[in-house]
Each structure stands twice: as structure tokens, then as C-alpha cells.
Amino acid sequence: MRVRYKPWAEDYLKEHPNLVDMDGAHAGKMSEWFDKEQPIYIEIGSGMGQFITTLASKFPEINFVSMEREKSVMYKVLDKVKELNLTNLKMICNDAIELNEYFNDGEISRIYLNFSDPWPKKRHAKRRLTYHTFLALYQQILKEDGEIHFKTDNRGLFAFSLESMSQYGMYFTKLNLNLHDEDDEDNILTEYEKKFSEKGSRIYRMEAKFHKSI
């Protein structure tokens, strides 16, 4: 989906430094940004924020971070955070390749990758969020028993991700080849997921972990 540029979005986000990190001010000290010291879950590529804001509302005992590089959609997440008065959700406006600039080693308990850009052309494979260079970043910031939760409607990206994670030495704790056939009451829909499901698209989901170091 092409995002329409909104020239005012950056200034709007900058008006809320208590909620949005635009310039790396909290890099390396994310835990201090929250009111309480709690486990941290992050979503990379939050879009308009339906998933992450629903999670933060449902689980106040968890701290959440929304990471989104598009300022022109991130303002929608900010609006939801303000509307719901969420104190356990902060936002980073940056690219996933900068993850280790923000988070310390072993600081994160869970990473969500929901409907990431599949980058279907082979020459763009390194941009996929399950490419091995990104997996190395995730391994660095995740706790030893940390998890990656992944959802997509793109069969090619799902197959690529299974292979990439397996080759990296990860293992899978859950695999769903048609998520909505299983009527999972705990599943929280993203904006894309709702749209794709209504069209009858198959939703693929997995949960994965890194093997513990010996």
C-alpha cells in the first residue's frame, strides 16, 4: 500500500516526546522511558496501530513499543495512544535496521512481525524482516527465551521465513497454515488481517525461538 505523504505529520509527532522518539533520545535506555519496569514487547511495522494499541489495552502488565518508519501513518498510532490513555506504549519512528541502537542485549521478551512487506523480487530479499541480518538483530536484543510472532497473508514470504529461520538455527513452537480456520480467540487482528480475511485470504502464522546458547 502506498502511503500518502502528510507534511504536517512530523511536527505533530514531535509535539509528543513523552510518547514518540523521533531522534534516538531514548536509545539504549528504553526501560527508563516507561512508568514501570515490566517485560517489553515490540511490534516492527505497526501501520495504523490497531494491533499494538489493542494489546497494550489488554495487557497493562506489559510495556509495548511500536516501531514504524512511516511518519505519515505513525500519527494514527499516536492518536489511538492518546485516545486510550495508554501509559505502557511508546513509539519509535525509525527503521528496523536500527534496533540495536535502541535496545540493549537481552532486553526484549517478544517481537511481533505482522504483515511485513514481502519484497517479492529476489534481489530485494535482504530487505525482508526475516532475512538473516534482521534475525541476528532480533537474537541480540531478545532475552534467551524470547519469542518472535509472525503473521502474513503472503505464502511466498511465509515459506521464505520458515527457511530463513530454520537455516539460522531457530525452531518453531507454533505453526498455523490457515489461522482463522482455527478460531483462535486470543488472536488480535491487524487492519490488514481484517481486510484480507474478509476477502477469504489464508493467514499464515508462526511463533519461533532461538536455541539457547550453551
From Swiss-Prot:
Gene3D superfamilies hit by this protein: Vaccinia Virus protein VP39
Catalyzed reaction equations: guanosine(46) in tRNA + S-adenosyl-L-methionine = N(7)-methylguanosine(46) in tRNA + S-adenosyl-L-homocysteine
Residues the record lists as binding substrate: 121, 153, 190-193
GO molecular function annotations of the record: tRNA (guanine(46)-N7)-methyltransferase activity
Protein known as: tRNA (guanine-N(7)-)-methyltransferase
Enzyme Commission (EC) number: 2.1.1.33
TM stretches of this protein: none
PROSITE patterns according to UniProt: SAM_MT_TRMB
InterPro entries named among the record's database cross-references: SAM-dependent_MTases_sf, tRNA_(Gua-N-7)_MeTrfase_Trmb, tRNA_methyltr_TrmB_bact
Gene that produces this protein: trmB
Record-level GO cellular component terms: tRNA methyltransferase complex
Binding residues for S-adenosyl-L-methionine: 43, 68, 95, 117
UniProt cross-references to NCBIfam families, sorted A to Z: PRK00121.2-2, tRNA (guanosine(46)-N7)-methyltransferase TrmB
The entry's keywords: Methyltransferase, S-adenosyl-L-methionine, Transferase, tRNA processing
Organism: Staphylococcus haemolyticus (strain JCSC1435)
Enzyme class: transferase
Pathway noted in the entry: tRNA modification; N(7)-methylguanine-tRNA biosynthesis
